[in-house]
Curated annotation (Swiss-Prot):
Composition bias type Basic and acidic residues, residue spans: 428-452
Name the record gives this protein: Methylenetetrahydrofolate--tRNA-(uracil-5-)-methyltransferase TrmFO
GO cellular component terms given for this protein: cytosol
Keywords for this protein: Cytoplasm, FAD, Flavoprotein, Methyltransferase, NAD, NADP, Transferase, tRNA processing
Subcellular location: Cytoplasm
GO molecular function (one): flavin adenine dinucleotide binding
The family this protein is said to belong to: Belongs to the MnmG family. TrmFO subfamily.
Function text: Catalyzes the folate-dependent formation of 5-methyl-uridine at position 54 (M-5-U54) in all tRNAs.
Chaperone recorded as keyword: no
Domain of life from the UniProt record: Bacteria
Length: 473
C-alpha cells in the first residue's frame, strides 16, 4: 500500500465520521464520501454529517454499572469525535446522555471540515469503489445505495439481511398541557447535565390506557412493498403498535411503565401507565416521545397520540416514520479487523456490520479507522481485549455470534446493542468486603462493577502496548 494515497471512507454518518476522524488524527490523509445532498434518503432531513435520524439519546452514561456507559468512557479515552461532540451538545435526560441533534451534527461537520487531512467529497458511490482505492471503509449504514449493496452481495455470494427501524414523533414543548403533565426523571435520577426532572410525563388511568392500546392496534399503518413484507423488526426498536399487538400489558411494562414516577397534580393516585417525552434540542422547545417509534400513517398518529392526557393539543415537529436497515452476516464475512474476507481492501463499519445503536455504530467506526491507519503504516494493532466494551462488541460482530451450523438449527445473525452478556465471565464471583456471598440486586450490582473495573484495567494495558497509531496516544 502507498503511504501517501488517502484512505477512503464511504458514508458520512456516525461511523464514517468517527472513522475519518481517527484516520486523520493518526496523521494520514482521508477522503470522506457522503452522497447527501446530491441524493437524499427517506430518513435524513439535512446534509449534515452524523445526522441523528431516530432518537437523540446515546443512552446511559453510567460507566460503572452500564455497558453502553462503559463504551462511552472507552471512546472518550480513545479520542472519539462523536463523544466529544455529544458531550458539548448534551441536553438534560435523566441518567442518559442525550444531545441537541442539530448542534451535534454541526459540531461533527465543522470538526471534519476544519481538519487539514480530511477531504469531504459530496458524491454517491453507487457500486464497488474503484480498484485504485486500496484502503476503503464502507460505513453506509442502513440506507446503503442499491448499487453498492448489490455489489457487496456479488462479492460475498450471499443475500444481506434486513430489518426495519421506526422513528418516534417529536412534539413542540409549548403545545403540551403542563396542567396535566409534569417534569420528573424516573426515580428522580439525575444524569449528565440533568436535574432529576428531565422528562415530561403524561399519565393514564386504566380505562385510558386500554382505549389507547385498542386504538393503536386498530390504527392504519403504512403498507409494505412486496420486497419488504418478510423483513423482521429489531426488538430494540419495535413500533409502538407492534408492541401493542403483542399483548395488552406489553406497553405498560415497556416504554409506558409507571414505576418511579409520582404525579404532583394528583399524588395519592398511582397512574396505570405513563407516556414519557425527552428533551430533543438544547433550547428545550422540542420533546420526543420515548419508545413511540411507529409506522402508523401520519393522520392516525395525530389522531391517536392526541388522546394521550396532556397531548390533546400537541403540535408535532416531526411525525414517526419507517425505514429499512440492511446489514451483513458479519461473523461469516468479516475478519477480526473488520475487513471483508473476499476483498480485504474493503472494511466495514457501523450499522451495516450488524451493530445496533448510535454509540455502537460510532465505536465500530472508531476501531475501523484505527485498524485502517495501523495497516497503512505497516503495523498491526494488538487485538482488543474482549473484556472491554469495544473488544466485546467487535468480537461479537466478527466471530462471537453462534452460527446455525454450531447449534444445528436455523439461526441468523441479528443486530446487537453492547451489553454485559457479550463480555467474558469473571474468573471469580464478587464477594462482600466481609467475605460473605452476595445475593440478589447486591450481587448483580457487584458483578457489573467488577466487569467495568476489569474493562478499565484491560483497556489501560492495551493502550500501553506498542504499535498503536498516533490517534490512540
Amino acid at each position: 500500500m502507498s503511504g501517501s494515497s488517502p484512505i477512503h471512507v464511504v458514508g458520512g454518518g456516525l461511523a464514517g465520521s468517527e472513522a475519518a476522524w481517527q484516520i486523520a488524527e493518526a496523521g494520514l490523509p482521508v477522503v470522506l464520501h457522503e452522497m447527501r445532498p446530491l441524493r437524499a434518503t427517506e430518513a435524513h432531513r439535512t446534509d449534515g454529517l452524523a445526522e441523528l435520524v431516530c432518537s437523540n439519546s446515546f443512552r446511559s452514561d453510567d460507566a460503572a454499572l452500564n455497558a453502553v456507559g462503559l463504551l462511552h468512557q472507552e471512546m472518550r479515552r480513545l479520542g472519539s469525535l462523536i463523544m466529544r461532540a455529544g458531550d458539548a451538545n448534551q441536553v438534560p435526560a435523566g441518567g442518559a446522555l442525550a444531545v441537541d441533534r442539530e448542534g451535534f451534527s454541526r459540531a461533527v461537520t465543522r470538526a471534519l471540515e476544519a481538519h487539514p487531512l480530511v477531504t469531504i467529497a459530496r458524491e454517491e458511490i453507487d457500486g464497488l469503489p474503484p480498484a485504485s482505492w486500496d484502503s476503503v471503509i464502507v460505513a453506509t449504514g442502513p440506507l446503503t445505495a442499491p448499487g453498492l449493496a448489490e455489489a457487496i452481495r456479488g462479492l460475498t455470494g450471499a443475500e444481506s439481511l434486513a430489518f426495519f427501524d421506526a422513528i418516534a414523533p417529536i412534539v413542540h414543548r409549548e403545545s403540551i398541557d403542563m396542567g396535566v403533565a409534569w417534569f420528573q426523571s424516573r426515580y428522580d435520577k439525575a444524569g449528565p447535565g440533568g436535574t432529576g426532572a428531565d422528562y415530561i410525563n403524561c399519565p393514564m388511568d386504566r380505562a385510558q390506557y386500554e382505549a389507547f392500546v385498542a386504538a393503536l392496534r386498530a390504527g392504519e399503518t403504512t403498507s409494505f412493498k412486496e420486497w419488504e413484507a418478510s423483513t423482521p423488526y429489531f426488538d430494540g426498536c419495535l413500533p409502538v403498535e407492534v408492541m401493542a399487538e403483542r399483548g395488552p400489558e406489553t406497553l405498560r411494562h415497556g416504554p409506558m411503565k409507571p414505576f418511579g414516577l409520582t404525579n404532583p397534580h394528583n399524588p395519592t393516585v398511582k397512574a396505570y401507565a405513563i407516556v414519557q417525552l425527552r428533551q430533543d434540542n438544547a433550547l428545550g422547545t422540542l420533546y420526543n416521545m420515548v419508545g413511540f417509534q411507529t409506522k402508523l400513517r401520519h393522520a392516525e398518529q395525530v389522531r391517536i397520540f392526541r388522546t394521550i392526557p396532556g397531548l390533546e393539543r400537541a403540535e408535532f415537529a416531526r411525525l414517526g416514520g419507517l425505514h429499512r436497515n440492511t446489514y451483513l452476516d458479519s461473523p461469516r464475512l468479516l475478519d477480526a479487523t473488520l475487513r471483508l474476507k473476499a476483498a480485504p481492501r474493503l472494511r466495514f463499519a457501523g450499522q451495516i456490520t450488524g451493530c445496533e445503536g448510535y454509540v455502537e455504530s460510532a465505536a465500530v467506526g472508531l476501531m475501523a479507522g484505527r485498524y485502517a491507519a495501523a495497516e497503512r503504516r505497516g503495523r498491526a494493532l494488538a487485538p482488543l481485549p474482549p473484556t472491554t466494551a469495544l473488544g466485546a462488541l467487535i468480537a461479537h460482530i466478527t466471530g462471537g455470534h453462534v452460527s446455525a451450523e454450531e447449534v444445528g438449527a436455523p439461526r441468523s445473525f441479528q443486530p446487537m446493542n453492547v451489553n454485559f452478556g457479550l463480555f467474558p465471565p469473571l474468573d471469580h464471583a464478587p464477594k462482600a468486603p466481609d467475605g460473605r456471598r452476595l445475593r440478589g440486586p447486591e450481587k448483580a450490582q457487584a458483578k457489573k462493577r467488577a466487569l467495568t473495573d476489569r474493562a478499565r484495567a484491560d483497556l489501560a494495558a492495551w493502550l500501553g502496548e506498542p504499535g498503536l497509531p498516533a490517534a490512540a496516544e
